[in-house]
């Protein structure tokens, strides 16, 4: 009838009548009133007729600005009616309170018990809120490209482009977004709460946990390793069953694609029971006491509100098939870093042939998902400082990916420190030049020099100093593909005095730069020291000999090179060696470190030299030396012909 009355007003405006004429109760024609059988009452003004009392339904307002309407049957309680609506949104009745909204005075609400008969509330409006003392945190997702090695917390697969919660650090793929738990634990706030056990009210007005729970959580946190206590370390506490939250009410004003998670939006919030938090913090510890929760009463939760009807066991059950042995123990997520996935169990690697021994370790050929090279380092009983420094360097080595670099595959720490790299079938450059005396052509020697400079340029771009650049560590793989190995690992190539790292001359004498031999600086190793070693390799390529072959005394070589009295004899370079290569060898072997070029300049010089080399193009008129197969079957008699008579 209101629409009809509005229509009459519209018509009246067309005839210049006043709107006040139609405002009274008698403005409608009696004919219209009789036809519709409806007469407007003063009590109906501004109120839509409520049909909920006749349809046995209750309107419920839920957290996160959601609402629903539930059907009521006889004998059902509020818990029974609202259980499904709460479950699909990832909520628990034990962490919520239900209120009945009172019309007068407006905004007042009366708390109800979950066991209240729902039939007595038909037609009423209810509101479900979180309990005030429930520690509540919401997700804050942001799109992120993980430049460092990362794995999805849901599918445990490699993660490059995905999302991460800025609060708890939970990271996942886009296609795994539907499985992200709704609970978000801000561990920095929890630890801040644990630091003040005597405060009853926090800054946000949230009551603190009871002393018993505080003490247990504080004991658990005290056992957390320091390495895992950072703001984004989040253990795998999402072990409870949560349904996927409905998309209704979770999108922004501009509806987005359902295949993309909402970025910078608060997800459906899951209240955090302190029992879950206590179990989560206990997961951080490797040696958590199994009876940490045995003293909790069964009828009350640690925070004081009533527990679910199902009693909670005092000790969490182990998953079937779990083993207490250390090798099968699954580490908590908060304790894992990306290096964990690169550690190889010693029992998985089978060593076979001993390849050789060097200054820093022994190399073996082994089997680990195929042929690998295992270098067992000469580090006996590493100190915690050495072990941590070794892990830091491994974190750098595992990021190296280049065609001219030996592929790093993992490391081992049990019994001895060892690194595992790809296996190179070819021999080292040293063996080719000085043992087998392989005869390379000049363009092949220049290409080997180019590939070596290319690999070293990559390492220096990664801020990795080789420290032991020599022909023994350059391998020719599957033909003439250069592979550089044994790079980095300053921890192994240095001497330790207690917990302090002391630099010492490392590498072979013939390839050591003069400043490294002198050891006058605190850290003589630099990009230029690698360039000097590379210059010695160029000298080997262009002469086929080792430098200082006329000096047989090792100490004399150290003294003369360190003082600058001796340098490689460049007159022994091959006669057909290009002049540009001769200049490059001389520049790399400069006695003053600052005068040596860096590898970007070296690489560009060699590439320019390669392009300038003369190439003999095949003549177009030259016949092919490879005859077709059918020509071999031609009989010589077919080529003879009868002599024709001459007229």
Swiss-Prot record:
Tissue distribution: Isoform 1 was present in all tissues tested: skeletal muscle, intestine, brain, gizzard, heart, lung, kidney, bone marrow, spleen and bursa of Fabricius. Isoform 2 was only detected in brain, heart and skeletal muscle. In brain and heart isoform 1 is more abundant than isoform 2. In skeletal muscle isoform 2 is more abundant than isoform 1.
Gene3D superfamilies recorded: 3.30.60.20, Phosphatidylinositol 3-kinase Catalytic Subunit, Chain A, domain 1 (3.10.20.90), Phosphorylase Kinase, domain 1 (3.30.200.20), Transferase(Phosphotransferase) domain 1 (1.10.510.10)
The keyword Kinase is annotated on this UniProt entry: yes
Molecular function in Gene Ontology: adenylate cyclase activator activity; ATP binding; identical protein binding; MAP kinase kinase kinase activity; protein serine kinase activity; small GTPase binding; zinc ion binding
Domain RBD, first and last residues per copy: 56-131
Biological process per Gene Ontology, one example term: thymus development
Chain residues that bind ATP: 355-363, 375
Function in brief: Serine/threonine-protein kinase that acts as a regulatory link between the membrane-associated Ras GTPases and the MAPK/ERK cascade, and this critical regulatory link functions as a switch determining cell fate decisions. RAF1 activation initiates a mitogen-activated protein kinase (MAPK) cascade that comprises a sequential phosphorylation of the dual-specific MAPK kinases (MAP2K1/MEK1 and MAP2K2/MEK2) and the extracellular signal-regulated kinases (MAPK3/ERK1 and MAPK1/ERK2).
PANTHER family linked to this entry: RAF PROTO-ONCOGENE SERINE_THREONINE-PROTEIN KINASE, SERINE/THREONINE-PROTEIN KINASE TNNI3K-RELATED
Descriptive protein name: RAF proto-oncogene serine/threonine-protein kinase
Protein source organism: Gallus gallus (Chicken)
